């Protein structure tokens, strides 16, 4: 029987299990300070054409989302997102538990627009009582979205420009990014994400790994002391090499990004259809 209710119906890509077994008795430093994590981070930087990017490995997507958002925002700030966005409806208030409100915008097929972002910020700033409200400080989007649609390069470019003009960070949830990258309807590359976003992540848990996400930070302002935030928010794995090894295995699956992750062909067909 084929199961489509979630991305967790199977274990991991065979290459992941093979590498974990092969290196099982290797002795390395903990907490992601090992050579496997370093090598995987280098591979990701190369794929993104972002040699100065900071790459951090997390145990899961919820930890990645709440850590990035809490580390980036000031205590009085919130994050603009679609009202269908994962952080707003499917993470048990994890972001809001850190003290940052999810400022939800009406979605259209899972997406929000640069125009909506500008309107929300301009409306906030025009309010005479704006200092009594939560200040927008970041935009969060998922790509693919929670309903399987894809942002185009033009849409992401417009959102990035709006964020830059308004002084907002742009954060892309890439828990299912591999699905989007392999879609025939996609026109975005990892290099585009690195150029247009302040921070994004490559999902592993939903895309062939047993667990793990790779957060890529391109904005220098967000890089300093970020590991403190990871540890404080429960995102740092003691046996961190397990994360680096899994991404190494996935990244070694092929020479181009289309071959990075193993996913069900039936789901890919659906993603290609729903754009």
Predicted regions and their residues:
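Conserved PLP-enzyme active-site core in the AAT-like
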Residues: 2-275
